[in-house]
A protein has these predicted regions:
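Membrane-embedded alpha-helical segments of integral membrane proteins
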Residues: 107-147
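Internal/C-terminal transmembrane anchor helices
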Residues: 154-178
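SH3/SH3-like beta-barrel superfamily modules
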Residues: 208-242
Length: 248
């Protein structure tokens, strides 16, 4: 009992500390002291761990100070946690419009685009809740099917149960896809004003193209210490120094 009370007090103090620190950061932002607000939001992330709200606020600070690479990075991190948040997505597109590189994504089939949009409607936890809800509803319909005396009720329960089973499977796949994106992050943002992408993981490699700050890349090969093989949205690939990018 004593341990429980101590744990509860520690949790309460931590929550109050977080609330005070966030209030200070919010206050600095309202005063238009964006640099101070950014430091405070960053310290909250260090102390409390990832939060879509704090990443979003931090991105707003960097947008105001015209640090576009950091802005894009934090919006991307916020969107990874809360993929269904329209405000984050809008601000991310706004920040991207201020980057130098204009990369036209390669064409993909409709089903791939549709599936990505579906999965990104919400986060893994919410998809999991939907899956549990569909499963429970399916079990209730199974009870109706087994014990109903009306043939019409049995048929309705059976076909509705099949639909819910399919939805349960679909929701679980969506939850897994979002969870996989969280734990196997391949996206990164170019943080340097400019970065050369080379044909080989060496400074002596042939220059293929140049990327600028704020551009997103996907890491294809993460095995080397100093170099990463990356791909941009139009399908071009090459090697870039690790020090000029930050993982989302």
């Amino acid at each position: 009992m004593r341990k429980f009370i101590i744990l509860a007090l520690v949790s309460l103090i931590a929550a109050q500390t977080y609330a005070v620190s966030k209030a200070q950061a919010d206050s600095a932002y309202v005063r238009e002291d964006y640099a101070a607000a950014a430091v405070l939001y960053d310290s909250l992330l260090t102390a409390e761990g990832p939060s879509s709200e704090i990443y979003y606020n931090l991105g707003n600070c960097y947008y105001k100070t015209d640090e576009i690479a950091k802005c894009v990075l934090n919006y991307e991190r916020a969107l990874l946690i809360a993929p269904g948040d329209d405000d984050i997505r809008f601000n991310l597109e706004l920040a991207r419009s201020k980057t130098i590189d204009r990369i036209i994504p390669h064409h993909e089939i409709f089903l791939v685009t549709w599936w990505r949009s579906l999965v990104n409607m919400t986060d893994a936890d919410t998809w999991g809740v939907y899956a549990v809800g569909a499963f429970v509803a399916m079990l209730l319909l199974l009870m109706f099917y087994l014990f109903a005396t009306s043939l019409w009720v049995q048929k309705t329960a059976f076909y509705s149960g099949v639909v819910l089973l399919v939805l349960c499977i679909l929701f679980n796949i969506c939850a897994w896809s979002q969870s996989d994106k969280q734990f196997n992050r391949t996206g990164a943002i170019v943080m340097s004003p400019s970065a050369v992408v080379r044909s080989t993981p060496s400074a002596s490699g042939t220059d293929l193209f140049v990327l600028h700050e704020g551009t997103r890349v996907e890491i294809l090969d993460d095995t080397m210490t100093e170099w990463k093989e990356v791909q941009i949205a139009d399908g071009k690939k090459g090697w870039i120094e690790k020090k000029v990018i930050s993982k989302i």
